Amino acid sequence: MRARHKIFEALKNTPEGLRFCRTWDKRAKYPENQYQNPFTLEEVLEMEGNGVGVLLGRHSTTTINGKKYGLGAIDFDGTDSDLTFEHHVGFDPAALTKTVTVTSGKKDRKQMFYWIPEEYLDVLKKGEYKHEGWANFELRIGDHYSM
């Protein structure tokens, strides 16, 4: 893996239950099915690639106070995506609980990660919500990876 040590330093304190896929230029372009055989951080860093993605839903789990959770993400993409979120969900995303957030550095783009209680993982559906063309947000849970 290119930049293996830099990636490890950035992710070494992530929860034990997170699972990863290898990527090339922000795409999972490899023959293995990362959803059937997800990798630990250590495993994925030994492979070819130039980045890693974290798998969502039941692929990346943790237990908090005896309760099991899977990882979910809300992806905000484009100017006014916060208004699109508010239109479809019913409240301003600024009211969301503070959480780990990542960005590519591009204006108005970010992903916010949340632990979803196990009983809701099958109830919540992946969805993409667009409003007036470009501004959208996406709820990512099941067979999906995030960069």
Give short role names for the model-derived ranges.
Residues 1-147:
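Conserved phosphate/metal-binding and DNA-contacting active-site motifs used
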